């Protein structure tokens, strides 16, 4: 086994991306998506159906609120935010199977995946810079 094979295989065991998380949700795979950002970020918008648990609260809340047999996917703001990694560490310490969603909320939104806030669903946006935007052809 090469160093590269070992490295990338290990990396993929611990991370996922917005497209794969959305596909897992649509397929009904049993995952819990956890937003580890703060209250203001959560109020602004989040992944539809996500649970809010800021990373600093995971140690005290997870056991009471989450089934430890269900895999967890954590996310924060963007590729430049490390709160997702901090949250993943906290879940791992507690024995949860956890993966970090790379790209965070930013890439979820840019890929046009469903989001919501306390008012309800938010408009879906599609950014052609990060994904293929397919237009429906009439006929």
Predicted regions and their residues:
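Flexible, polar/low-complexity N-terminal or interdomain linker segments that lie immediately upstream
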Residues: 1-33, 37-44, 117-139
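Conserved beta-strand positions in the Rossmann-like core of class I SAM-dependent methyltransferases
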Residues: 32, 51, 99
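Glycine-rich, highly charged phosphate/nucleotide-binding loops
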Residues: 53-61
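Catalytic cysteine-centered active loop of the rhodanese-like fold, especially the PTP/DSP P-loop
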Residues: 63-109
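Short hydrophobic/charged patches on amphipathic alpha-helices used for structural packing
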Residues: 22, 62-63
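Short Asp/Glu-rich motifs
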Residues: 61, 110-111, 127-128
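Short loop/helix-cap segments at secondary-structure boundaries that form the rim of catalytic
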Residues: 42-48, 108
